[in-house]
Amino acid sequence: AIAAVITFLILFTIFGNALVILAVLTSRSLRAPQNLFLVSLAAADILVATLIIPFSLANELLGYWYFRHTWCXVYLALDVLFCTSSIVHLCAISLDRYWAVSRALEYNSKRTPRRIKCIILTVWLIAAAISLPPLIYKGDQDPQPRGRPQCKLNQEAWYILSSSIGSFFVPCLIMILVYLRIYLIAKRSSSRRKPRAKGXPREGESKQPQLRPVGTSVSARPPALTSPLAVTGEANGHSKPTGERETPEDLVSPASPPSWPAIPNSGQGRKEGVCGTSPEEEAEEEEECGPEAVPASPALACSPSLQPPQGSRVLATLRGQVLLGRGVGTARGQWWRRRAQLTREKRFTFVLAVVIGVFVLCWFPFFFSYSLGAICPQHCKVPHGLF
């Protein structure tokens, strides 16, 4: 019965991970650079299912190591290599999720296939550094008992503790702290969005008069509109007669440059205190401010009702605002794409948190008992069947 269950798990592992690799390599929607982590992780799991589990099953069923001693040393090194690689891959994925959520604007521009491949190479090098010492340093080996040969993991305390810390406990601690940080960021973002949904202004934000779009009537002209650009024609020393319509040439006077300073669209204003206050809040502000996230003046920062579209120039006139440049549709489409991307990042982070939590719970008993045998081998020895 055990052999049948393990055989089914081997086939299921190979088939499922092969589908993951095939989907990422063939589906255009899954060709994002971060999905290379899943390809490498699936490859490590396939190697475990093909090169490790069958020999472990044979060793358990026969009760001794049927294969040669050389293959035993290689088999143990590959076992540590592939299992450590799987765990460190999950740690790297959790860090990638954290950077994608906390530093969305900055990290997404740096998340290139080359960068992801370098991280994957680092993961495999860490796993190799943990698995190779038993092959290089044999240490004081106990003589083999007479009878059938056995193939066991390295029993020296220094290697047990160092490999357990590097393979499991350090990555596990990093994953727990990272997902706790992601949870706090999501909770803070949700609590910030609630008062703004009710119409309450942000702390420290003064109430600004509402500027109506072009073509609507304005009952009371705000004082902010009385500028050299507000009364067209006065820059040349005369005004338009009553009843004469304004032309586009009159609205834009070359002799009167706009008095509002330009604010870049690349998010620099947020770093200088216009919108966000920390890298973790950049993604939140990108979603909160909406498609009109870049204000025409510092007084209009982070106020959705007063924002012009991104990439547009705003001129104040007697009738309200005149928008020059790119239209609202393009800016709104870009904002919705960014918001959808951030939503996918958060949803994928939740799924990965569940998967990693189950993975950690499955690995913890082994590494705990394995380390406990090195700390107190006489009094804390775990029964062989339970191990």
Curated annotation (Swiss-Prot):
Topological region Extracellular: 63-72, 141-156, 376-384
Record-annotated disulphide pairs: C72-C151
InterPro entries on file: ADR_fam (IPR002233), ADRA2B_rcpt (IPR000207), GPCR_Rhodpsn (IPR000276), GPCR_Rhodpsn_7TM (IPR017452)
Gene3D superfamilies listed in its UniProt record: Rhodopsin 7-helix transmembrane proteins (1.20.1070.10)
Membrane topology: Multi-pass membrane protein
A single cellular component GO annotation: plasma membrane
Single GO biological process annotation from the record: regulation of smooth muscle contraction
Ranges of compositional bias, category Acidic residues: 279-290
Presence of the UniProt keyword RNA-binding in the record: no
Localization annotation: Cell membrane
Regions crossing the membrane: 1-25, 37-62, 73-95, 118-140, 157-180, 352-375, 385-387
Protein keywords: Cell membrane, Disulfide bond, G-protein coupled receptor, Lipoprotein, Membrane, Palmitate, Receptor, Transducer, Transmembrane, Transmembrane helix
Region (Disordered) location: 193-303
Tree of life domain: Eukaryota
Cytoplasmic side stretches: 26-36, 96-117, 181-351
Record family assignment: Belongs to the G-protein coupled receptor 1 family. Adrenergic receptor subfamily. ADRA2B sub-subfamily.
Subunit structure: Interacts with RAB26. Interacts with PPP1R9B. Interacts with GGA1, GGA2 and GGA3.
Function description: Alpha-2 adrenergic receptors mediate the catecholamine-induced inhibition of adenylate cyclase through the action of G proteins.
Protein name as catalogued: Alpha-2B adrenergic receptor
Primary gene name: ADRA2B
